[in-house]
């Protein structure tokens, strides 16, 4: 059973507080768009697909509550304006993640179309929104499984399978991933981690490697948590060990399996294939190119922004300096009522300036393929992606 980052029933929404993982499993209820804005901005929920779904469902829950308390306007246009303003507010919580903006635009269009229908009232407009938001949750899991299957097949056909000379079972692959792209970042199963899950399910995965992913440690806190939960053979490395991992194949050690592919997620893919993802992704792509390792981006089509021509047009969110200068976690070995006391530790010199971009942009030239729910997009002979074709 995979982890659930989002639990939803009609009128009720809770998220797994990812700031407390892997030490505590706590679900936070969200009752409104305002609750979701803070949860997203504080990164209690993260991952581009999950952010969009939580934002959409939070407003669905708020609309349900307003209707139940007879506080919803009977005027369809007033409800339309209310929904659009809330969606615009939600988009401001994490501007780099295109899924949220895409969902807001799509949901806003559905609401506007419903409001134009002769004879409808405000409640029917709200119902149209709620139904569309709920479909997002269902579609995301289905799309993620398709991404996993397409990606696994591509890696097995195009990656370099590990061989018996390195102590591995012939025909299996080892994959390196970055940040967290699994059930905790989506409605379920995951994108890049979904590919790893699919490889594992078919017995084709030798080992998964996950980076620590500084400064927020989504790899060590979240991806490692999912891999252990699913009993997938995995090894954690710090971010600055990736080059050594790709360069060496030491028999008899934990790092004895050669890496066949690097698979990452995305927060926004530009029309030319340039990809914004968690800081450190660009460096991994450079390392992959140098070492002849396949580099893949796994993302649903909702992450592809055809209105953004290149990565130069992507706005990169910058995070607080405390995320770099401080580390938070439980005190080792001491428990009170079954819980270990959480502490925040300073790890940098006071007064030092900090630059903390949340994302970087990987040029399309370094990407071998973009795995979507309708297949893997590869570049043509001239080295260009043609992403518009998957929307036809």
From Swiss-Prot:
Pfam families: IF-2B (PF01008). It catalyses: 5-(methylsulfanyl)-alpha-D-ribose 1-phosphate = 5-(methylsulfanyl)-D-ribulose 1-phosphate. It comes from Ajellomyces dermatitidis (strain ER-3 / ATCC MYA-2586). Its EC number is 5.3.1.23. GO terms for molecular function: S-methyl-5-thioribose-1-phosphate isomerase activity. One of its GO terms (biological process) is L-methionine salvage from methylthioadenosine. One of its GO terms (cellular component) is nucleus. It is found in: Cytoplasm; Nucleus. The keyword Metal-binding does not apply. Keywords: Amino-acid biosynthesis, Cytoplasm, Isomerase, Methionine biosynthesis, Nucleus. This is Methylthioribose-1-phosphate isomerase. Catalyzes the interconversion of methylthioribose-1-phosphate (MTR-1-P) into methylthioribulose-1-phosphate (MTRu-1-P).
């Amino acid at each position: 059973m995979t982890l659930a980052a989002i639990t939803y029933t009609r009128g009720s929404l809770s998220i797994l507080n990812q700031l407390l993982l892997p030490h505590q499993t706590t679900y936070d209820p969200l009752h409104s768009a305002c609750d979701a804005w803070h949860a997203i901005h504080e990164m209690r929920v993260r991952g581009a697909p999950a952010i969009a779904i939580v934002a959409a469902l939070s407003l669905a829950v708020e609309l349900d509550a307003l209707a139940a308390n007879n506080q919803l306007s009977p005027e369809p246009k007033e409800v339309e304006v209310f929904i659009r303003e809330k969606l615009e507010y939600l988009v401001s919580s994490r501007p780099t993640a295109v899924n949220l903006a895409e969902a807001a635009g799509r949901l806003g269009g559905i609401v506007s179309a419903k409001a134009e229908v002769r004879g409808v009232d405000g409640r029917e407009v709200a119902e149209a929104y709620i139904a569309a938001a709920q479909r997002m949750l269902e579609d995301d899991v289905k799309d993620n499984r398709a991404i996993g299957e397409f990606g696994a097949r591509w890696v097995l056909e195009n990656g370099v399978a590990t061989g018996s000379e390195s102590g591995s079972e012939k025909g299996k692959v080892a994959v390196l991933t970055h940040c967290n792209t699994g059930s905790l970042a989506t409605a379920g199963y995951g994108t890049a981690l979904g590919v790893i899950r699919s490889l594992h399910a078919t017995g084709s995965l030798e080992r998964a490697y996950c980076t620590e992913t500084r400064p927020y440690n989504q790899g060590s806190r979240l991806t490692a948590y999912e891999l252990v939960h699913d009993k997938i053979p995995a090894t954690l490395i710090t971010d600055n060990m990736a080059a050594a991992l790709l360069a060496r194949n030491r028999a008899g050690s934990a790092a004895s399996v050669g890496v066949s592919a690097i698979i990452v997620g995305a927060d926004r893919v530009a029309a030319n294939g340039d990809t914004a993802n968690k800081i450190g992704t660009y460096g991994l792509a450079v390392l992959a190119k140098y070492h002849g390792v396949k580099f893949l981006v796994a993302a649903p089509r909702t992450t592809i922004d055809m209105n953004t021509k290149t990565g130069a047009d992507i706005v990169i969110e910058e995070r607080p300096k405390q995320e770099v200068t401080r580390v938070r976690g439980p005190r080792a070995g001491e428990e009170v009522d079954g819980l270990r006391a959480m502490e925040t530790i300073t790890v940098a010199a006071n007064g030092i300036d900090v630059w903390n971009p949340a994302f970087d942009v990987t040029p399309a030239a370094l990407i071998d393929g973009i795995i979507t729910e309708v297949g893997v997009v590869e570049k043509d002979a001239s080295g260009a992606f043609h992403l518009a074709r998957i929307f036809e």
